Amino acid sequence: MKKLWSVIILLFLTSFLVISFSGCDQLKISNLKANKHFKLANKYFTDEKFKKAIGEYEEALKLNPDLKAAFYYLGSCYVSVYKPGDDSEKNKEFGTKATLYLQKALEQSPDNKDIIQSLGDINDKMRNFDQAEKYYLQIQKFTPNDPASYYNLAGFYSNNRKYDKAIEMYEKRIALDPADAEGYLYLAGFYQDNRKWDEAIKNHEIRIQKIDENATMEEKAKAEFLADAYYRLGVVCWNKSYQTPADVMASVERLQVVQKGHDALTKATELSPNFPDPWAYLSLLFRQKTIAEPLKKAQYDKEAEKMVQKFQELRKRKLATEQFMKDLSKEK
């Protein structure tokens, strides 16, 4: 009887071990297959074949739901195939899945800036302003002293027509280092894009002042930065005159704006004699003078033509120099 029970127990243990090993083998095989799909998906991801990558990542997760490394890449693939403005059900599904997998990835790595940035981007694309803002503000908290984080937020607010918040971000960036001329350049660009000419002019002038006050900058570099700053100021002055109809801007004001632009562009040519672009806008400013003083049209047209010729001469010289340098590099 004891022998019979021993045989039964042995058979039970043997069958249990067979089942256990079979289960382990099956799990091991599934994981190996999952890794194969994951590896292929990564290749498709690198090659920017995102739809193919999606299929492979999803297959990998079916075989191994614990393959958590796939969450971020799968979410990023869905971000890449999502088309803003497309209200089809399929596209909405892409957006939903992008958010789902990126949130799963964030649960694994709560402080991963790339994941948070991607969540901000997909919510921005899906016009989920509050969610996008939440994630972008999280990114900014990681790098409170990085100017780029303020520029990114300002761009986000501007694109969503939250102009007061955009200005706030530009001003916060300037507050990081008020002596740094770069912050005023970005704020001036924002005002110019929104046709706020006077505010743009003001910030370009502050930029010029900050560059001029920089005692640590080498003279050659300072001259180049100042030439660029005066050029940009001149361009805004031309824009203000060109974009403002004659019945809105009086002749006296127009001449003042044109003169400010003329002085700035002339300064740019003095600081950078081989810089062709200021001459093109000097020509355009003379055309604007004819609006304020139509009786002097012939005189101003003649001056404008001189500026065009100077621009063409310098432009031709610049292109020839660039071509020479390219040819020289090929010979090395």
Model region roles, listed by residue range:
Residues 59-60, 104-105, 138-139, 172-173, ...:
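Canonical positions in the second alpha-helix
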Residues 31, 65, 110, 144, ...:
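Short coil turns that delineate tetratricopeptide repeat
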Residues 32-59, 63, 121, 125:
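Alpha-helical segment of the N-proximal tetratricopeptide repeat
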